[in-house]
Amino acid sequence: MNSHSTDKRKKITRIGIGGPVGSGKTAIIEVITPILIKRGIKPLIITNDIVTTEDAKQVKRTLKGILDEEKILGVETGACPHTAVREDPSMNIAAVEEMEERFPDSDLIMIESGGDNLTLTFSPALADFYIYVIDVAEGEKIPRKNGPGLVQADILVINKIDLAPYVGASLDVMESDTKVVRGERPYILTNCKTGQGIEELVDMIMRDFLFTHVQPQGEHA
């Protein structure tokens, strides 16, 4: 929010969702959005691409009838999306402020961006919290490679766990290594196709980012 703002609009939580290309960031957004809406949360979505708005178009198609397409905005960065969410987030800050102005009753904005390998982080001027997404197909050694995105993220998502047997990856090893490099910071294993771990991820977002009471599993309306 602009420091000079004196209006009474509520603070809309900004959540960055980053990770390597192909890790499943867009898929994560597509599966958690209907659950958030079902639980009474009003989301907005911003995606980042270099020279297109293809991710935004994909999300609009997938969430048609679930989320008004005007609440999904694509940003063409013209350069590495990594730069546009960390070193110079001005384009994304402008996009966020535009969405906040248009939809002031929203509860959260998800800002999706790819980045270089494991180095992507979000400027605190842009995101209040951020989720980093990796996938099993990258190999079980990925957590051991550290990287600021993987280590510092508020939540680490290890996605596409169904692919583990096909790429020779051990989920036990990945979990063990994740605990070593992240310490007490939370992580979760997910499968967007089956929904495994997705409700739990939404629980974490609501509890840790939105500070909303979360019902025990199985009690969601």
Curated annotation (Swiss-Prot):
Domain of life (superkingdom): Bacteria
Subcellular location(s) of the protein: Cytoplasm
Alphabetic keyword roster: Chaperone, Cytoplasm, GTP-binding, Nickel insertion, Nucleotide-binding
Keyword Methyltransferase annotated: no
Principal place of residence: cytoplasm
Stretches assigned to coiled coil: none
Function comment: Facilitates the functional incorporation of the urease nickel metallocenter. This process requires GTP hydrolysis, probably effectuated by UreG.
Subunit record text: Homodimer. UreD, UreF and UreG form a complex that acts as a GTP-hydrolysis-dependent molecular chaperone, activating the urease apoprotein by helping to assemble the nickel containing metallocenter of UreC. The UreE protein probably delivers the nickel.
Protein name listed in UniProt: Urease accessory protein UreG
Organism: Yersinia enterocolitica serotype O:8 / biotype 1B (strain NCTC 13174 / 8081)
Gene: ureG
